[in-house]
Amino acid sequence: TEAMCMPCFTTDHNMAKKCRDCCGGNGKCFGYQCLCNRG
């Protein structure tokens, strides 16, 4: 399963970066979830 970080908020313009950082550089927002891609 994919690890999940904090929820992604569309009002936060830095959210994509926060999600990537939380996932160790490989993650993206999908809806309101931050999904980590295990690479």
From Swiss-Prot:
Protein name: Chlorotoxin-like peptide MeuClTx
Organism ancestry: Eukaryota, Metazoa, Ecdysozoa, Arthropoda, Chelicerata
Modification type Arginine amide: residues: R38
GO cellular component, one term: extracellular region
Family recorded in the similarity comment: Belongs to the short scorpion toxin superfamily. Chloride channel inhibitor family.
Function: Inhibits Kv1.2/KCNA2 potassium channels. On glioma cells, may interact with chloride channels (probably Clc-3/CLCN3) and MMP2 at the surface of glioma cells. This complex may be then internalized via caveolae, thus inhibiting the chloride channels necessary for cell shrinkage and tumor propagation.
Location in the cell: Secreted
Molecular function per GO: potassium channel regulator activity; toxin activity
Residues of the signal peptide: 1-3
Principal location: secreted
Bridged cysteine pairs (disulfide): C5-C22, C8-C29, C19-C34, C23-C36
